[in-house]
Amino acid sequence: MNDANKLPSRPLLAVSLSLALAVGSAHAQAPAPGAPLTIAQIKAMLGEQGYTKVDDLKFDDGLWKAKATSGDGKRGEVRIGAQGGRIYAEGARSKLSEAEVVASLTSQGYSRVHDVKYEDGLWEAKAQTSSGQKQQVYADPTDGRVVSAQND
């Protein structure tokens, strides 16, 4: 039998299988695209971003909300997108103006956009869907996309 047809040694095979299993199990723990995040994943994400003392973690208005201390020692409210996991911190500045947010919501199919305000790191507005349903909408401060929408 030539060298190309030989099986790898048992120790090498064992190491290879162990690595394959480790990579497979790590991949299995990652959330599926579009899947809602768990409390453990939310806490881990906040910790990775330097937040400590995470309290009062709850799901409300289609968003995760918590009180936490940031890496620079400031205590405040954070909101976390339920599916994307993006963190919106109280006191963070918006890259969009109110008019740009209204334009973004309109381009996403909303009409009668009003009561627009920037609060706790997210834009909030009342709007109407194309089917006429009134909703409370939360929009991302960097691109204006809807993070959460709840029937009003």
Where would I find each of the regions flagged by the language model?
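N-terminal secretory signal peptides
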Residues: 35-75
